[in-house]
């Protein structure tokens, strides 16, 4: 499983990976920018992993996750891609850590999401 992160969520993901078992099956890539996408890196990730999970601190629709889906479609990669972005609905304002918790993006929530996807792609 490759986890691609866009934004400050990268720190939470790194912290989470330090505390979960089977981290050899998971690699985290902090994708520092969306435009332009690092196509060379994406090709190597898509060839190496059986599933991709994209975390972004933007709305799913039209964001980094959409760009990853478009890349996969254009390059004809056929592996599961799970998007974890902000739903296209009102999200209350507040401290980032509280919003992350509300979205299930705290250490516990991310760990569960990783485990679920790993179990589905065995």
Residue spans of the language-model regions?
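Thiamine diphosphate
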Residues: 1-122
């Amino acid at each position: 499983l490759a986890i691609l992160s866009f934004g400050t969520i990268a720190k939470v993901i790194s912290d989470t990976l330090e505390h979960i078992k089977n981290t050899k099956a998971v690699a985290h890539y902090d994708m520092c920018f969306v435009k332009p996408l690092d196509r060379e890196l994406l090709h190597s990730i898509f060839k190496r992993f059986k599933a991709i999970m994209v975390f972004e601190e933007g709305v799913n629709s039209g964001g980094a996750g959409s760009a990853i889906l478009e890349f996969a479609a254009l390059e004809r990669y056929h592996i599961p891609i799970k998007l974890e972005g902000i739903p296209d609905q009102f999200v209350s304002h507040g401290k980032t850590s509280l919003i992350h918790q509300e979205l299930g993006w705290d250490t516990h929530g991310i760990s569960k999401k990783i485990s679920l996807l790993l179990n589905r792609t065995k």
